[in-house]
């Protein structure tokens, strides 16, 4: 069976910004919002906005734009934010702790229910009211909590070892915040976040302002 084509990453990454604006329009009691308005707010070209929104399956109405409520539903469904997904944080260090406490995830249906670490000083304690378990408990806790996602925040030198444990435990999606490209079976999905890329863009924009 052929693999389903994944939409272009830039288009997908812009959808949350669109969703934020459309929800604001809903709060302002607007029934429709145009691609032009979205484009102006985000400093994009209207044709780009329309192209991005087509991947959600919604079509705008001439001279009116997009129905606000339907657009919210379409974007959330496309992103998978209309259904709750449970997640484990693997690595209870500074980054893992920060992500565990980010309340915005819950707005998008991501429920972080536990953290894991190999440091005995952290095991048995809590971070942001989440229990911290030892890595040797991962398989047992996967059966108990049934998470779909592992958020990987361990030090880079332990990334592959932790990824192996995640795969063995049966989790099929890894959000990788380490700077290591981990190796996993084809059946496991990996999304790598490169925080340095965002910093690089910030640096370039600052240089152009000088």
From Swiss-Prot:
GO molecular function annotations of the record: DNA binding; DNA-binding transcription factor activity
Binding site for NAD(+): 91-96
InterPro entries tied to this protein: CoA-bd, NAD(P)-bd_dom_sf, Rex_DNA-bd_C_dom, Tscrpt_rep_Rex, WH-like_DNA-bd_sf, WH_DNA-bd_sf
Biological process annotations from GO: negative regulation of DNA-templated transcription; response to redox state
NAD recorded as keyword: yes
DNA-binding region: 17-56
Record bears the keyword Transcription: yes
UniProt keywords, alphabetically: Cytoplasm, DNA-binding, NAD, Repressor, Transcription, Transcription regulation
Predominant location: cytoplasm
Subcellular localization, as worded in the UniProt entry: Cytoplasm
A GO term from the CC aspect: cytoplasm
Family stated for the protein in its record: Belongs to the transcriptional regulatory Rex family.
HAMAP family with a match to the protein in the record: Rex
Function: Modulates transcription in response to changes in cellular NADH/NAD(+) redox state.
NCBIfam families noted in UniProt: PRK05472.2-3 (NF003994), PRK05472.2-4 (NF003995), PRK05472.2-5 (NF003996)
Assembly and interaction partners: Homodimer.
Protein name: Redox-sensing transcriptional repressor Rex
Organism of derivation: Treponema denticola (strain ATCC 35405 / DSM 14222 / CIP 103919 / JCM 8153 / KCTC 15104)
The gene coding this protein: rex
